[in-house]
Amino acid sequence: MNSQITLFFFFFSILSLSQISNSSSLLKPHPCPILPLPSSQQLQWQLGSMAMFLHFGPNTFTDSEWGTGKANPSIFNPTHLNASQWVQIAKDSGFSRVILTAKHHDGFCLWPSEYTDYSVKSSQWRNGAGDVVAELASAAKEAGIGLGLYLSPWDRHEQCYGKTLEYNEFYLSQMTELLTKYGEIKEVWLDGAKGDGEKDMEYFFDTWFSLIHQLQPKAVIFSDAGPDVRWIGDEAGLAGSTCWSLFNRTNAKIGDTEPSYSQEGDGYGQDWVPAECDVSIRPGWFWHASESPKPAVQLLDIYYNSVGRNCLFLLNVPPNSSGLISEQDIKVLEEFSEMKNSIFSNNLARKAFVNSSSIRGDQSSQFGPKNVLEEGLDKYWAPEENQNEWVLYLEFKDLVSFNVLEIREPIHMGQRIASFHLETRKTGSGEWERVVSGTTVGNKRLLRFLNVVESRSLKLVVDKARTDPLISYLGLYMDKFSGSSRNTTKITITRTLKEEQQLHDL
């Protein structure tokens, strides 16, 4: 009997120890996301970073920007049109999708619409049997990049424009053609522009949105007010220094949204509506023989102020009257890509030992600070709950020189950070000195410094957040192109022999 009791307690003890061991190995759950959150298509759109706009149509041949809708269709004759060239240039330059003006304000359709004769079927191109949308859709699919389509609400050719029901039926029919004949569409672009003195027109936006989501559920819809993507409020490609993906759609109206609200978003917004920054590589949106492209360094500056401010960079690269992207533009895009890749291919922070003020769970947690050196949304640093400070520390064996800071949030968990700053230690005194400050982060925040910083000890401090901050990536880079690297500020700290040995052993 005693031996049975002893055996019972032995197995009970083993079972208890096993349960304790299993309990201690359980992972701390992920923190709760904070609303609003991006949809799957919004998330994919934001991670795409850059898209190429293609303004093309009769305006390309009439040397105009806003066509009257009266140009003879026969003028449209791009004899060397090659949509594969457009797509390959976009892909080689790092763009995730192309967006074509299938119909601009002049009403001319780049596909053979069954609802108007004012289209490619009335032109000389391909003897009236051509379809620009079809050729681009095929090229994009083959290259593996997304396709977006622009369908102007304002139509200067269509006679029923101004007749509310009749024109909305016309527009919805053309939209249906585009969304059912050309495969998967990633973005539908609705321009809020309309000239002064034009006919009054009520658009059935809610019906349009419902139809688009019904026919192309993976597409995002762009307009001044969303519902999925908003306009940044200018045509210079520049976002606000504070830029939330949060937005209140009830505070916005297509064609009449306060520019500052579009620029900054709304930290208290109830909707997730990230911003898109559109700008043309040339002075005009359509190709003009008399115009030249912006220099590559200017595109780099726009990249910092769009992608680097939590937005998508939509760069217009208009095909010329031959139907090709001009060599001038190609050269600029190649230079821009080389600059961008040269800067961001080498994250100097990867050389650092990273620590933090706290970790959600414990030191063996899946939310440790080393996660910020790995790209991707799945891993991130999360501090312990209810802390009064949120800090990441970076220590380097050797001096590191940089003039660009990158921070990313795992936006599938919501946008959280409202302000932050970077500090480095002074030589000799060891006191912390602020280098740069910023506000929102979101998908990606890039900050350039006036001076190059040389340091061994850094700390990133989150000053304010909507809830406990999460950081998915941290980068330090050297930009030798922007003109901000002429001055060097050497900021170092002497360490004890023990500290040096600890770093040496990493």
Swiss-Prot record:
Record's keyword terms, sorted: Apoplast, Glycoprotein, Glycosidase, Hydrolase, Secreted, Signal
Substrates-to-products reaction catalysed: an alpha-L-fucoside + H2O = L-fucose + an alcohol
Gene Ontology BP term (one): glycoprotein catabolic process
Signal peptide: 1-23
A GO cellular component annotation in the UniProt record: secretory vesicle
Enzyme class, first EC level, given as a word: hydrolase
Xref: Gene3D superfamilies: Galactose-binding domain-like, Glycosidases
Record's subcellular location: Secreted, Extracellular space, Apoplast
Highest taxon above the source species: Eukaryota
Hydrolase recorded as keyword: yes
SUPFAM superfamilies: (Trans)glycosidases, Galactose-binding domain-like
GO molecular function, a single term: alpha-L-fucosidase activity
Known EC number: 3.2.1.51
Carbohydrate attachment residues: 22, 82, 248, 320, 355, 487
Keyword Lipid metabolism: no
Homology family: Belongs to the glycosyl hydrolase 29 family.
Stated role: Hydrolyzes both 3- and 4-linked fucoses in Lewis determinants. Not active on neither 2-linked fucose nor on fucose in alpha-1,3-linkage to the innermost GlcNAc.
Name this protein carries in UniProt: Alpha-L-fucosidase 1
Naturally occurring in which organism (per UniProt): Arabidopsis thaliana (Mouse-ear cress)
